Amino acid sequence: LAQAFVMKPAVLESKLASVGTEPAEDKVVIALGQTDGTFAYTSTANNGFWCEANGNVGNWGDTAPVYVEFSGLTMTYGHRKGVSVAGQKYMLKPTLIYTRNGVQYKATIVLNMQF
């Protein structure tokens, strides 16, 4: 990711805003790509996102089987037993967005999960 944004890892981490922050100049924010091409920024998990089966942001409960969470640049992901369906595939698109001189640069991580 540091190479994608042309910066050293320590610099990237120093520019990282907390999950829930909207894009801002000279900051790297974490968002969740939605199926309609937009991004969700509001955290619904522990510094991350609970996700619906289609990969869109959701809330913890009976309709959000998977999640992705962040601690700095460390990403954790998993599923909620009893809500996730054995054998079903889930795709999440956590995205880091860096804004510089008013231009947004995006690095998308595609998580394909199956339990």
Question: Over which residues does each language-model region extend?
Answer:
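Functionally constrained cores in energy, signaling, and assembly domains
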Residues: 73, 94, 115
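Residue-level detector of solvent-exposed, low-hydrophobicity positions
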Residues: 56-57, 97, 112
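A short beta-strand micro-motif common to beta-rich folds, especially ectodomain repeats
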Residues: 86-100
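Context-gated lysine
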Residues: 8, 15, 27, 80-81, ...
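Surface-exposed binding patches on compact interaction domains or structured appendages
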Residues: 1-75
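Extracellular/luminal low-complexity segments enriched in Ser/Thr/Pro
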Residues: 69-87
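Short, flexible beta-strand-to-coil junctions
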Residues: 33-34, 81, 96-101
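C-terminal edge beta-strand
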Residues: 103-115
